[in-house]
């Protein structure tokens, strides 16, 4: 069996996915290799804005638009840690490149740059991440827990978090409400 690589793809939770955290989620896969996968849920927000988060970290945000940018709940792993998905990749400490333009950074330097209006052009800030051990995601895919589709920057950075799941579904020509819990074969 040939290994799959879902880096820079969306995972769309199927209705039958029994894990309540991932129900009706859209997850962006930042890295997927033989050791496992790492991603961020990109359609579930917290009650915290990026402006409030930066202020809580002792920073003085300069951009008023940050008060309208929600912090996302990226996943159930390390929910006390922040992760910034951004374009362009840039030269931040602790950055993982998902593709030539999109990076995931888990260091304070990028947050300080965002507060000072010197950060990347496009950002999503999340608390926590989603992780899969080696072979775990492949097993979940075989159980029809997820649909996959190549990610689009437009969906990540130009749409509100509520619009992201339906937009990703539309890439597949599917309406989420038409999905069934039942698996069948033709």
Curated annotation (Swiss-Prot):
Which InterPro entries does the entry link to?
AlgH-like (IPR003774)
One GO CC term on file: cytosol
Per the UniProt record, one Pfam family is DUF179
Q: Which domain of life is it from?
A: Bacteria
Q: Which family does it belong to?
A: Belongs to the UPF0301 (AlgH) family.
Name this protein carries in UniProt: UPF0301 protein Neut_0448
């Amino acid at each position: 069996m040939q290994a799959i690589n879902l880096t820079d793809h969306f995972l769309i939770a199927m209705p039958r996915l029994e894990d309540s955290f991932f129900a009706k989620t859209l997850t962006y896969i930042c890295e997927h290799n033989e050791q496992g996968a790492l991603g961020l849920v990109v359609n579930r927000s917290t009650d915290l804005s990026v402006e409030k988060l930066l202020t809580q970290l002792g920073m003085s945000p300069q951009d008023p638009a940050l008060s309208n940018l929600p912090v996302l709940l990226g996943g159930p792993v390390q929910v006390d840690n922040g992760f910034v998905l951004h374009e362009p990749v840039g030269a931040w400490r602790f950055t993982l490149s998902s593709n030539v333009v999109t990076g995931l950074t888990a260091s304070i330097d990028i947050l300080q740059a965002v507060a000072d209006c010197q950060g990347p052009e496009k950002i999503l800030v999340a608390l926590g991440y989603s992780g899969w051990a080696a072979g775990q995601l492949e097993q979940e895919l075989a159980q029809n827990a997820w649909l996959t589709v190549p990610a689009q920057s437009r969906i990540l950075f130009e749409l509100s978090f509520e619009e992201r799941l339906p937009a990703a579904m539309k890439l597949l020509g599917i309406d989420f409400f038409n999905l069934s819990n039942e698996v069948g074969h033709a």
